[in-house]
A protein has these predicted regions:
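Cell-envelope/glycan interface and biosynthesis
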Residues: 29-30, 34-237
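Bacterial N-terminal signal peptides that target proteins for export
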Residues: 1-7
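A cross-kingdom marker for long, charged
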Residues: 233-256
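N-terminal export signals
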Residues: 7-23
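Generic structural signal for short, solvent-exposed loop/turn connectors between secondary structure elements
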Residues: 1, 21-26, 238-240
């Protein structure tokens, strides 16, 4: 049977990844399960919060271009890209940056809006690397993030001394700022992220060449592995890499 030129063009224009309805519902189910203190259930195409708030997920809508989702993400968009836990198999594919696509409305409701004040009332001080180079850092108590980071720190202190130079000093946790290329709040604005030693790290914007992003990383996976065990994802697994960066995103990674 002859294939028309229009059929070929439509096929080429289709999204590379198409989420089936059942698959999309399963991913949204993982989102609800990841935040039991805040999310009650999935009701059709709506996430119901424990306070009764109903939030549309965007389920059933066609997948949009990466740059559009990055700046205007639905909850379904937030769950589209799978985070590859475990040792890296190689550089991330083009635009595969699981965790960068996120709904600002979702996280502002969960952690508070630092631009309006009061979010810091949910923070407490965590001492970063107390046996190596103590440094007080504010971290959110929502979703037990502060407690989980303390577990990370305890394990990092057990690593060989040769790895400590990648960790200290930390480049910070809470910072009420936006992401440079999107204008949306960073996970640092929720005090749910930490940057390790910037002097030993790499960032995609520093290395961009003629529209391409050559992958660079100096952070040993032994460090990222400790964070992943507590459900922090690593920016070193993003196409738009940020190798100093870790953020608490339990909907994207399993763990205790």
């Amino acid at each position: 049977m002859a294939v028309s030129r229009r059929t070929i063009l439509c096929a080429l224009a289709a999204p590379l990844f198409v989420t089936r309805p059942a698959e999309g519902a399963e991913r949204l189910g993982r989102l609800v399960a990841a935040y039991p203190h805040h999310l009650a259930r999935l009701d059709g195409q709506v996430v119901v919060w424990t306070d009764g708030t109903r939030m549309e997920t965007g389920a059933g809508r066609p997948e949009r271009p990466f740059e559009v989702m990055l700046r205007d993400a639905t909850l379904t968009d937030q769950m589209r890209q799978a985070y590859p836990a475990g040792p890296p198999a190689g550089p991330p594919g083009r635009n595969h940056s699981p965790g960068r696509i996120r709904s600002t409305a979702f996280f502002v409701k969960m952690y508070g809006d630092c631009r309006r004040g009061g979010a810091d009332r949910r923070h407490r001080t965590v001492t970063w690397m107390p046996q190596t180079r103590p440094q007080p850092l504010p971290v959110t108590t929502e979703n037990d993030v502060a407690t989980r980071l303390e577990r990370v720190i305890a394990e990092l202190e057990r690593l060989p001394d040769r790895l400590k130079a990648y960790l200290v000093p930390s480049s910070g946790t809470f910072n009420c700022r936006t992401v440079a290329d999107t204008g949306l709040l960073s996970m640092h604005a929720y005090a749910a992220a930490i940057d390790i030693n910037v002097a030993r790290s790499d960032y995609w914007s520093w290395a961009r060449e003629r529209g391409d992003i050559p992958y660079r990383n100096r952070i040993p996976f032994e460090i990222a592995e400790v964070f992943e065990a507590q459900r922090f994802i690593w920016g070193g697994k993003w196409y738009h890499y940020d190798t100093m960066h870790f953020e608490y995103r339990p909907e994207l990674i399993g763990g205790a």
